[in-house]
Amino acid sequence: MTFKPSTVALALVLGAASSVTSVSTAWASDGCGRASWYALTSRTASGERMNPAKLTAAHRSMRFGTKVQVTNARNGKSVVVRINDRGPFIRGRVLDLSKAAAQDIGMIRSGHAKVCYEIIS
């Protein structure tokens, strides 16, 4: 059985594109970086009113409603938050947590912390 060079080239390009997509998707779903917290009461990007007492967070691209486990890298404390807003808009930050979520993982005083996060649903 023989294949035309153009068919082989197309298969290679499509195969490479699909592997790049899966790698970038995996990278976007879990990671580590700096998180901050906020306690505004304005409307979020999802349309709901921000409630600092709820376990919510902002992320630049995760779907609204996504549940994410966030762990403070310094003390190992974790919290599960629901993505309901967009942000953070400060370079180098990966998440903006509600005040309640920040309190649960012990980062109120510092205002920001290194965290690792993982999508759980």
Regions found by a protein language model. Give the residues of each.
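Secreted/periplasmic proteins
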Residues: 2-121
